[in-house]
């Protein structure tokens, strides 16, 4: 039995949730998101909470039970508060700037890298060495942050590159004579 899945997902104040078959839709102050559950999961809206239960006790249904509940909880948090991911840039001459809606990165290449964010994602650059990616979809925010980090990931000797703000880089010692 899933300890995560058996807890109903409370609908926070200020959010309207609707359940139509396998689809949960959440509308809140930040926008609207939906989640479509697998056919092996049943969804019900009871007492201002979404109850997630497996249709049968197969291994496949039980494995999707807790994940479905967590995804529904994630869309509620997204439309209420949103998600954000902070990135830091380390290195001499490495910096970020906004160019309209696009992000312009100087990362030591012969050219500047211009990143165009997808619809629903906003990027802010409070300092030239700090990038904040925000949006309502947790998966999309993480994907965009990973794509930006991928341009120049942190290297282990000096730590130069783009890294997550909460990431700890394991440093290596340089070669000795």
Swiss-Prot record:
One of its GO terms (cellular component) is cytosolic large ribosomal subunit. GO terms for biological process: cytoplasmic translation. One of its GO terms (molecular function) is structural constituent of ribosome. It comes from the Bacteria. It holds the Pfam family Ribosomal_L6. Keywords: Ribonucleoprotein, Ribosomal protein, RNA-binding, rRNA-binding. InterPro entries: Ribosomal_uL6-like, Ribosomal_uL6-like_a/b-dom_sf, Ribosomal_uL6_a/b-dom, Ribosomal_uL6_bac-type, Ribosomal_uL6_CS. Signal peptide: none annotated. Belongs to the universal ribosomal protein uL6 family. Part of the 50S ribosomal subunit. This protein binds to the 23S rRNA, and is important in its secondary structure. It is located near the subunit interface in the base of the L7/L12 stalk, and near the tRNA binding site of the peptidyltransferase center. This is Large ribosomal subunit protein uL6.
């Amino acid at each position: 039995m899933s300890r995560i899945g058996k807890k109903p997902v409370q609908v926070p104040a200020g959010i309207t949730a609707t359940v139509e078959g396998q689809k949960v839709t959440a509308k809140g102050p930040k926008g609207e998101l939906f989640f479509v559950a697998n056919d092996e999961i049943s969804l019900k809206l009871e007492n201002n909470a979404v109850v997630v239960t497996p249709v049968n006790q197969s291994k496949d249904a039980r494995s999707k039970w807790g994940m479905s509940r967590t995804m529904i909880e994630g869309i509620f948090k997204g439309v209420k508060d949103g998600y954000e991911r902070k990135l830091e840039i380390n290195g001499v001459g490495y910096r970020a700037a906004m160019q309209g809606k696009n992000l312009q990165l100087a990362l030591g290449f012969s050219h500047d890298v211009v990143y165009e964010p997808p619809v629903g994602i906003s990027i802010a650059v409070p300092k030239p060495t700090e990038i904040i990616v925000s949006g309502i979809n947790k998966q999309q925010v993480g994907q965009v942050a990973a794509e930006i980090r991928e341009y120049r990931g942190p290297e282990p000797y000096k730590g130069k590159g783009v890294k997550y703000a909460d990431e700890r880089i394991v440093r290596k010692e340089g070669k000795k004579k």
